[in-house]
Structure formats: C-alpha cells, structure tokens
Amino acid sequence: MTRAIMETDKGTIHLELFDQDAPNTVKNFVDLAGKGFYDGLAFHRVIPNFMIQGGCPNTRPGEQGMPGTGGPGYKIKCEINPNKHESGTLSMAHAGRDTGGSQFFICHSPQPHLDGVHTVFGKTADMDVVNAIRQNDRILSVKIEA
C-alpha cells in the first residue's frame, strides 16, 4: 500500500492510499505530489463537521484564479468503489462525474451521501490535525512512500 505524508501548518497527516480500489486516482495524486504540485497550496474550503478541501492551484500565492476552480490542466475519471466516506476518508473532489483533477477532501465525520458519488482513494487516522485545519491553512509538502 502506498503512503503519503502531508505536512501542513497544523501538523502531519499520514495517508494510506487505496492502490487496489482507485489505482488511477492514486497514481494521479502520487504523480502530482512528486512534482511538488501540492506544496504551498491552501485548504480553500473548510466546513466544520464535514470536511477540509485542498489541491486547487489557484490558492498558490500570486495566482489570479478563483480558489476552488483550478486543477492540473486535465480531468480524470471517477473510480467509484465500495469504500465509505467516514472520518478520515481521503476522496477526490469534482464538479461533476469525471471532472476531478487535483482537488481532494478529507472528511471530519461520516458523509454517506457522498458514497458512490466521489472516489475514495485513501484514509488517515490523524484526525487531531485534520480537525485543527482552518480555511487558508497551507499544505507545506506531500511526500510519497511506496
């Protein structure tokens, strides 16, 4: 199982990535992390008791676009799988089926209405850090461990 270490303003989030259940989504996340794509981006959407969302390049200092509307310049297909949106679930954000790219979210609590809609591709147990993150806190780096 591939693991990612996400350093944030509020601490470290260790992520287990679901290579078997969402191989293309995991590969995309790993590739973007390897290029430093996520480094310095903000969590642009934080809804208490729901989720934190990041991965929009428009949150990089000096960018002009509206936060929450950016991506890597391409879209990936959804990989809906049996994993549920529970506390600590890492899932792909999108603006409609097969429109994801770089934005992701981590759930604060179970969100069953998202099951079968968004691609679950990982999980964290570091809920103290997830719960401490506020809007505009930053991702410092994402490192991948095979």
Model regions and ranges:
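Cyclophilin-like peptidyl-prolyl cis-trans isomerases
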Residues: M1-A146
